[in-house]
């Protein structure tokens, strides 16, 4: 409140009441960073409709399915049941540029071009448009989904011509198509009519009454791997996580206090490798076996697990790493209540940087424990370096080597 228009309130909670509350607070502050009349349009999914479609396919109410640019068999918590249900549909067709879990269970697969071979247009936020144009000709005998729709609807236009006609009639208002195509973007200056929330009707009691679980699982996407669409790219697999410095894997991050309580640990081997315990995590009746990284600074009572791993379709065997965290993504909520128990097995990590003793570094840094420091002679924990003279070892402080 003191910050006034310079203030901004944000929330990462997947809850409608929390989002409405933040919306109301920023409106009340008249925050300069809050622009409700030009919202970002990058995420327009409807969870209720997606859940309804998934349940309809599994129950048999829906008889046919066409997918484009999505892989629900991999990216939903009911993916395994959904995959079996898709096999039993009367008709299923997957438009995709690469084989994935959904396509593997579909009756028909239609090859689509890569996005660098395709035309497209986007509205990133209200009134701000962009054009995508191919950088190369199609390498294979593929066809864009939009061109297929145009043919099925009886249109003789190509998708490029359809985009051009739509922009000229509804967006450009007489401006030059060639100029916009050259620039790649266009801002119309229009904005949405934003209705100020009724603060008196926002019921915040669910937030106040919400109880915190004993252990919360935070599902997240890694900087390099994302949701796993590019898991067949070895450069992204090799890219180490900026925090844990681990590559080629996902894992359960946990605080030191919780790790000690659960009997989980990380160990360093003599050659500088990092090993870790396995844990069994259970949420909503589903269990996964996951290796553990003890992460300094993590909040007690929370564990983290990244999306994007565990893919088995469309990848070479040596790149089929990690486990699929989407199986715990119940109702598309990134925070889940979980139970954790330690397993006896140990996992070998590909970690590019450890955060404690580095073996084989010689005398760059002297170190010892407090007990040895207090009970042993100095020569035990901090010996004077020696040099060789006439094949005889002398301390570097000896007059013999001057």
What role is predicted for each listed range?
Residues 2-5, 31-36, 62, 125-134, ...:
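Short acidic (Asp/Glu) and glycine-rich catalytic loops that position anionic groups and cofactors
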Residues 144-168:
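Non-catalytic, well-ordered alpha-helical segments in soluble enzyme domains
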Residues 29, 153-156, 262-263:
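A broad structural signal for alpha-helix termini and local helix breaks/kinks
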Residues 23, 27, 80, 100, ...:
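Active-site phosphate/pyrophosphate- and oxyanion-stabilizing loops and adjacent acidic/basic residues
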Residues 38-44, 51-139, 167-402:
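A cross-kingdom feature strongest in bacterial/archaeal respiratory oxidoreductases
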Residues 1-58, 169-173, 177:
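Active-site phosphate/pyrophosphate-binding segments
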Residues 18-21, 82, 145-148:
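Stable alpha-helical elements in mature extracytoplasmic
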């Amino acid at each position: 409140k003191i910050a006034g228009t310079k203030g901004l309130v944000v929330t990462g909670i997947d809850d409608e009441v929390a989002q409405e509350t933040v919306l109301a607070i920023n409106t009340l502050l008249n925050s300069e960073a809050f622009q409700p009349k030009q919202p970002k349009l990058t995420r327009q999914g409807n969870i209720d409709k997606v859940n309804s479609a998934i349940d309809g396919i599994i129950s048999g109410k829906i008889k046919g399915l066409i997918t484009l640019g999505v892989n629900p068999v991999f990216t939903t918590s009911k993916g395994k049941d959904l995959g079996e249900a898709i096999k039993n549909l009367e008709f299923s067709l997957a438009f995709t540029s690469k084989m994935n879990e959904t396509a593997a269970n579909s009756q028909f697969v239609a090859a689509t071009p890569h996005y660098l071979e395709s035309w497209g247009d986007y509205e990133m936020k209200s009134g701000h448009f962009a054009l995508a144009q191919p950088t190369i000709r199609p390498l294979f005998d593929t066809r864009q989904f939009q061109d297929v729709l145009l043919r099925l609807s009886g249109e003789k236009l190509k998708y490029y011509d359809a985009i051009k006609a739509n922009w000229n009639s509804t967006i450009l208002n007489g401006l030059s198509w060639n100029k916009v195509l050259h620039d790649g973007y266009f801002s119309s200056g229009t904005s949405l009519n934003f209705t100020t929330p009724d603060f008196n009707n926002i019921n915040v009691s669910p937030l106040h009454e919400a109880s915190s679980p004993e252990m919360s699982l935070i599902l997240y996407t890694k900087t390099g791997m994302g949701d796993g669409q590019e898991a067949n790219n070895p450069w992204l697999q090799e890219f180490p996580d900026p925090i844990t410095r681990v590559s080629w894997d996902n894992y359960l991050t946990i605080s030191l206090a919780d790790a000690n309580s659960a009997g989980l640990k990380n160990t360093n081997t003599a050659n500088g490798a990092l090993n870790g315990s396995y844990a069994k995590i259970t949420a909503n009746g589903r269990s996964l076996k996951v290796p553990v990284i003890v992460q300094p600074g993590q909040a007690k009572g929370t564990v983290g697990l990244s999306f994007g791993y565990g893919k088995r379709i469309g990848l070479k065997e040596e790149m089929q790493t990690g486990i699929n965290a989407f199986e715990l993504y119940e109702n598309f909520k990134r925070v889940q209540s979980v139970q954790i128990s330690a397993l006896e097995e140990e996992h070998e990590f590909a970690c590019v940087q450890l955060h404690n003793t580095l073996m084989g570094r010689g005398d760059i840094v002297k170190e010892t424990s407090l007990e040895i420091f207090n009970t042993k002679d100095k020569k035990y924990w901090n010996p004077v370096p020696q040099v060789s003279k006439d094949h005889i070892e002398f301390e570097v402080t000896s007059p013999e080597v001057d």
